[in-house]
């Protein structure tokens, strides 16, 4: 199959693009920065609507994957950019393939942060109530048309950027001791598991919004413990921190897609194997 991945140099995008390539698919990456692992790349900016339209119209893609977004702190500092990239951009992609009557579908990434975390758990029918610029712009960007798929979940994964702000990147730079929130509950996927979910979905005809998460949740303390076990040989001291009480647990009720995510321990174990096999991409990580 032919895939176009927007944000191919980012935390999620690089994993998705490289995984799909290694599965034998034709993958074109779209990003501002060149990446070493893709032969086919378009270097451009998400603001360049002409380049985006031409790339999609000429590419004959089966799926366009949107892994572009402005994260929390940056969204607060640049609300207009967040409104466009998080909220408007995914709808622009969806409209483009609909108006041009292309067979191409759009896969979009959303987040548990569309919810405030005060009244969890949340299903696909729950009304987003997040209050920050990031929360609201990500909620605005969710696609619910009859052709696109929105994958809603939190994500963790490696970053080829040593200055990336993701949880795993942060953890890999720690020597300890560090605190892990025991009352902050998490549901999500590794970026590797998300890539697998997207590859599976590309072969299906379903559409709409899916809380793509395993059954059940874990605390951030438990999640850090899995990182510690699989990536640092339990070398980092992690203490329990009960100062944060937050439950953004997602519950999946839409099973139109057959893919079922692996358990959290297996996801992190699989991710550790991936990082070890691709350690040239992550020289800033010291593996235990």
What are these regions (language model features)?
Residues 29-52:
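Adenosine-cofactor binding site in Rossmann-like domains, unifying the SAM/SAH pocket
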Residues 44-87:
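NAD(P)H-binding glycine-rich loop region in Rossmannoid oxidoreductase-like domains
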Residues 195-247, 280-288:
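Mid/C-terminal beta-alpha module of Rossmann-like enzyme folds, strongest
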Residues 120, 131, 143-188, 192-193:
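NAD(P)-dependent short-chain dehydrogenase/reductase
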Residues 1-23:
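N-terminal Rossmann NAD(P)H-binding glycine-rich loop of SDR-like oxidoreductase domains
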Residues 263-288:
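Amphipathic terminal alpha-helices
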């Amino acid at each position: 199959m032919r895939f176009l991945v927007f944000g191919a140099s980012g935390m999620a995008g690089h994993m998705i693009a490289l995984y799909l390539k290694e599965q034998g698919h034709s993958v074109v990456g779209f990003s501002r920065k060149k990446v070493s692992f893709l032969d086919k790349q378009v270097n451009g900016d998400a603001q360049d609507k002409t380049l985006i339209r031409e790339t999609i119209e000429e590419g004959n893609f089966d799926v366009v994957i949107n892994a572009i977004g402005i994260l929390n702190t940056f969204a607060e500092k640049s609300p207009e950019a967040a409104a466009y990239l998080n909220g408007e951009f995914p709808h622009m992609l969806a409209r483009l393939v609909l108006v041009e009557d292309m067979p191409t579908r759009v896969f979009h990434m959303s987040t548990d942060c569309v919810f405030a975390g005060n009244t969890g758990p949340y299903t696909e029918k729950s009304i987003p109530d997040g209050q920050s610029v990031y929360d609201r712009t990500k909620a605005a960007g969710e696609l619910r048309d009859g052709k696109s798929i929105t994958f809603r979940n939190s994500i963790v994964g490696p970053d080829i950027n040593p200055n990336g702000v993701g949880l795993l990147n942060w953890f890999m730079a720690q020597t300890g001791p560090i605190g892990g929130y025991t009352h902050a509950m998490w549901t999500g996927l590794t970026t590797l598991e998300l890539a697998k979910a997207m590859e599976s979905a590309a072969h299906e005809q379903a559409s709409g919004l899916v809380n793509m998460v395993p059954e059940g949740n874990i605390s951030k303390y438990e999640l850090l413990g899995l990182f510690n076990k699989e990536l640092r040989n339990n070398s980092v001291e992690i203490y329990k921190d009960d100062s944060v009480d937050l439950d953004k647990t997602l519950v999946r009720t839409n099973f139109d897609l057959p893919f079922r995510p692996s358990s959290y321990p297996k996801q992190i174990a699989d991710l550790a194997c991936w990082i070890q096999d691709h350690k040239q991409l992550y020289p800033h990580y010291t593996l235990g």
